[in-house]
Regions:
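Short beta-strand->loop
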Residues: 14, 23-28, 115-122, 246-250
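Ligand-binding cleft/hinge of the Venus flytrap
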Residues: 22-25, 33-46, 86-88, 125-146, ...
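A ligand-binding cleft/hinge motif common to bilobed small-molecule-binding domains
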Residues: 56, 60-63, 71-83, 128-132, ...
């Protein structure tokens, strides 16, 4: 990898999703993408994005030294910090328990007993569930082999699980597409969202540059504008639009899904 210097290439690994990276109508978009693009511009570097299909793949890409930065809505953890350098937090989230409206609504941790819980592969929610299971062995969960929160929301929407744990930001964005999936309650803890730096002797230097950028982004309003653009108007999204989209997914997607999946894995 090139060093983070003007004229060089910044390589970022991320995952697909509305809060991270996706292909919009005309160009790439996503909250994390907007930030790393601004970072590349601030450093006068070109940007190359690598998309991982699982959270494990995100960190494997860093471990192999194939990316400078992982910007994928990653929550900070002691386990991850032992392996990689991390930046300061740029977004605070909360873990939320979600369920399908009209079904049983848990209202507290105690209500999770004997429910079928699903989480995203590689997410830090497994750590929290392990702690809960120490207090209550009846707490059980399954891991979905995906890095996309939409797959978790879809599982709840189709009735394939009782509840799921998601980060609050991802849930807010995805609820627009899955209006029948609702928040049951929040876990009373704050999740610090950070970038992780690649496995490289220069990672400490890269961390300083990234932190300088994030500090400036907080001061000059860049971060606030990105938050407003991706999270600010979610609560006002049209439910009719959401149901219309869901109907199109049910009726039109099956015809094209095999081809889409084939191309995605090529």
């Amino acid at each position: 990898l090139d060093n983070l210097e003007p004229g060089n290439e910044l390589v970022v690994v991320t995952r697909n999703g509305p809060t991270t990276y996706y292909l919009g109508a005309d160009e790439p978009a996503g909250f994390d993408y907007e930030l790393v693009r601004a970072f590349a511009e601030a450093e006068d570097m070109s940007l190359r994005v690598k998309v991982a299909f699982t959270l494990e793949e995100v960190f494997e890409t860093l471990q192999r030294g194939e990316a400078h930065v992982a910007a994928a809505g990653l929550t900070q953890s002691t386990e991850r910090d032992q392996l990689f350098e991390s930046t300061q937090s740029y977004l605070d989230q909360q873990p939320v328990v979600v369920y399908k409206a009209g079904q049983y609504k848990p209202r507290s941790i105690e209500d999770l007993t004997d429910l079928d819980i699903v989480i995203m592969q590689g997410s830090q929610h497994a750590i929290r569930l392990n702690l809960l299971r120490e207090l209550n062995p009846a707490v059980r969960w399954r891991v979905l082999e995906t890095a996309e929160s939409s797959a978790v929301m879809s599982a709840i929407n189709r009735g394939e699980a009782d509840v799921a744990l998601l980060d609050s930001g991802e849930f807010s964005m995805q609820q627009r597409l899955y209006p029948r999936v609702a928040k049951a309650f929040e876990l009373q803890t704050t999740l610090n969202t950070v970038w992780y730096l690649g496995s490289d002797p220069r990672a400490g230097e890269w961390r300083e540059k990234a932190n300088d950028f994030l500090s400036a982004a907080k001061s000059d309003g860049t971060l606030k504008r990105a938050e407003q653009a991706y999270f600010g108007n979610v609560a006002y999204a049209s439910r009719i639009e959401s149901f219309t989209f869901q109907r199109a997914v049910r009726t039109k997607l099956p015809k094209w899904q095999p081809l889409i999946e084939k191309v995605a894995h090529e």
